[in-house]
Amino acid sequence: MKYSIEQVMRLVDHSGLKPYLTEKDIARLIEEAKDMGNYAVCIEPIYGKFAKEYLDEKRYKVKLDVTIDFPFGSLATSSRKKIIEDSDYADEVDIVVPMGYVKSHRWDYVDQDLTDVVKIAKDHDLVIKIITEDGYLTQDEKDRLYRSVIRAKPDFIKTSTGFANKDYCASLGNAAGATPDNVSLMSRIAEELGSDIGIKAAGGIHTYREIESIIDAAKRPIDPEKLRIGMSGTGKVFEEMKKIKK
């Protein structure tokens, strides 16, 4: 293996985002993240304060990451800003781009929204990752949106939610989750713009080999401050890597 279990697991935001999860499921998610050495847990904000109290009580070093306007990116900017303000108990937020504006090519609205949400996050000392949901984008839209995101100066640009409509993605010739090609494009555009923005790949990541190809495409240090992998099936990859190691 090119990368060790410890290196890979430290990049992971261990995710539990299904709407039917319970407090017991969230507690289990946190315990799994701690045991596997993951950087963060990524959850819906309904369980944010529960998770914060659980982490504090256990004194775990796992970071708390909550999603905003997820998975659709359909709320007004004012609502998005308010939810970020209300999430100041967290360490990080992952927010979807305003997708309707993106698909309508209202780039003025997109740029203003992204500038506003990044500012609010920074005002509350939150790491912010902006999700492009690139399976919904044409090649021209990817090129334009990636530039908008990078210029807004969030901490990370992120590929996908993991909940994209596969039929719509397929109609554009796209996969519904993270791909090395899109990660590579993010990296190239960031370099062109003189940015060292972090990259987070998420959606449809199930194997070590997929992770390896994404890490190589990102051209980022093996450091959770610059590179993340979001996945719910972390345990399967953990077990797979232990077998490969043997």
Curated annotation (Swiss-Prot):
It catalyses: 2-deoxy-D-ribose 5-phosphate = D-glyceraldehyde 3-phosphate + acetaldehyde. The keyword Cytoplasm applies. Pathway: Carbohydrate degradation; 2-deoxy-D-ribose 1-phosphate degradation; D-glyceraldehyde 3-phosphate and acetaldehyde from 2-deoxy-alpha-D-ribose 1-phosphate: step 2/2. GO terms for cellular component: cytoplasm. GO terms for molecular function: deoxyribose-phosphate aldolase activity. SUPFAM superfamilies: Aldolase (SSF51569). Keywords: Cytoplasm, Lyase, Schiff base. The active site is at 94 (proton donor/acceptor), 158 (schiff-base intermediate with acetaldehyde), 200 (proton donor/acceptor). Its main location: cytoplasm. The keyword Phosphoprotein does not apply. Its EC number is 4.1.2.4. It is found in: Cytoplasm. Pfam families: DeoC. Coiled coil: none annotated. GO terms for biological process: 2-deoxyribose 1-phosphate catabolic process; carbohydrate catabolic process; deoxyribonucleotide catabolic process. Belongs to the DeoC/FbaB aldolase family. DeoC type 1 subfamily. Catalyzes a reversible aldol reaction between acetaldehyde and D-glyceraldehyde 3-phosphate to generate 2-deoxy-D-ribose 5-phosphate. This is Deoxyribose-phosphate aldolase. It comes from Thermoplasma acidophilum (strain ATCC 25905 / DSM 1728 / JCM 9062 / NBRC 15155 / AMRC-C165).
